[in-house]
Amino acid sequence: MRLVQLSRHSIAFPSPEGALREPNGLLALGGDLSPARLLMAYQRGIFPWFSPGDPILWWSPDPRAVLWPESLHISRSMKRFHKRSPYRVTMNYAFGQVIEGCASDREEGTWITRGVVEAYHRLHELGHAHSIEVWCEDELVGGMYGVAQGTLFCGESMFSRMENASKTALLVFCEEFIGHGGKLIDCQVLNDHTASLGACEIPRRDYLNYLNQMRLGRLPNNFWVPRCLFSPQE
């Protein structure tokens, strides 16, 4: 196993099975964040993640963290909160604001550089990247974004500026996703937060098998149309 240097003249990736064991999943470096390369990466179970100033690094970890939407864990306190939620939840109303929120709300620093913001905004304009927004009145207080692969959604990042805002985004999205034929959410790498919400780890080969099947599936044509998903009770 060795780290592969990508060419700017080809969007081809090596097999994820060749990724390093340490650091877990590191597969390649270099290339660019063009829409064609990003889409090729997601189709092969690969994603970019790197620190500012570093070369672009491409990953496919083993095991892979995923969330089956029907297994989303909602605590009793969250259920009570959601019944009286003050939030309105929308889809694809403010992609740019959501990714900017994810970039600026990370206390430990962020991998979401200006180049990353621009790259995913291009994917959004092409209809591949999508956002969920959480509003308190007219203020954006939380949200999440990711990349669609048929009936699989590759979650990238979320942020929260008010109580339970990001959890509300995920809860409402999961309900909508399941209801329209969505199957699986990719969480990339397990952490305490995603584990508390019901995410689990599966072998990379299983994830790649699911991806190869689900990316050929289809949600309704109007699923990603900008719309309101949830409004607070009057």
Swiss-Prot record:
- Annotated catalysed reactions: N-terminal L-lysyl-[protein] + L-leucyl-tRNA(Leu) = N-terminal L-leucyl-L-lysyl-[protein] + tRNA(Leu) + H(+); N-terminal L-arginyl-[protein] + L-leucyl-tRNA(Leu) = N-terminal L-leucyl-L-arginyl-[protein] + tRNA(Leu) + H(+); L-phenylalanyl-tRNA(Phe) + an N-terminal L-alpha-aminoacyl-[protein] = an N-terminal L-phenylalanyl-L-alpha-aminoacyl-[protein] + tRNA(Phe)
Q: Name one GO cellular component term.
A: cytoplasm
Keyword Transferase set for record = yes
Instruction: Tell me where on the tree of life, at the top rank, the source sits.
Output: Bacteria
What are the entry keywords?
Answer: Acyltransferase, Cytoplasm, Transferase
Any one Gene Ontology MF annotation carried by this entry is: leucyl-tRNA--protein transferase activity
Subcellular compartments: Cytoplasm
Would you identify the family this protein belongs to, as annotated? Belongs to the L/F-transferase family.
Purpose of the protein: Functions in the N-end rule pathway of protein degradation where it conjugates Leu, Phe and, less efficiently, Met from aminoacyl-tRNAs to the N-termini of proteins containing an N-terminal arginine or lysine.
Q: What HAMAP family does the database record attribute to this sequence?
A: Leu_Phe_trans
Q: What is this protein called?
A: Leucyl/phenylalanyl-tRNA--protein transferase
